[in-house]
Amino acid sequence: MDAKHPGVRVASDREPAANAPRPPFRWKSRLGVAVTLFLILGGLNFSFAVAVPITLHLFGAASFGGQLVLGDGADHCAFLGRCLSDIERSDPAMAAFLVAFMDTMCAFMMSFAVLQIGLAWYALRRAQKWALWSSLISNLAAVPYYLAIGWMWAERGIPVVGSLLVTIGPTVILAIVATVVGRSGMQRAKGLPATAS
């Protein structure tokens, strides 16, 4: 708070104002690598959020051996007590429900992708620290959900640790690497001459 003007907030000394001069952005810098990695993660979410529903609506819940809905074919057969191809033949309403369920997941993936791409492009590129940490935390926020899914499968005697590592491991690793590299790039950029952005 400003002593002369009660109720008026003053910008923090730690983080410059959004319109303050900043070092010029360079793609071939550490911050540029971080922005690129977060854009790739957003692009992957965007791609899957488009491709999965299209594939499921065109070819059904059992397309690609059911991997788009429940992972490895043997696993989903054990989890459901019957395979997705059997469900499509004997219970089309359940198959349609599973496709609709995947649609809801893909809707959230799309909104996350748009937000992640916008955050990387408009805020992280301008070296906003909050954007870096928000990008990391938003990627890590999915981990507890995948652990809960893994727990549910494990309760039914289905080993899915390897599948979960393949599913979420690369995105978590990329997000952590992007954050470390981006933080290093921001610290390094503090020594460069500032320009108006």
Predicted regions and their residues:
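Topology signature of small-to-medium multi-pass alpha-helical membrane proteins
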Residues: 2, 8-197
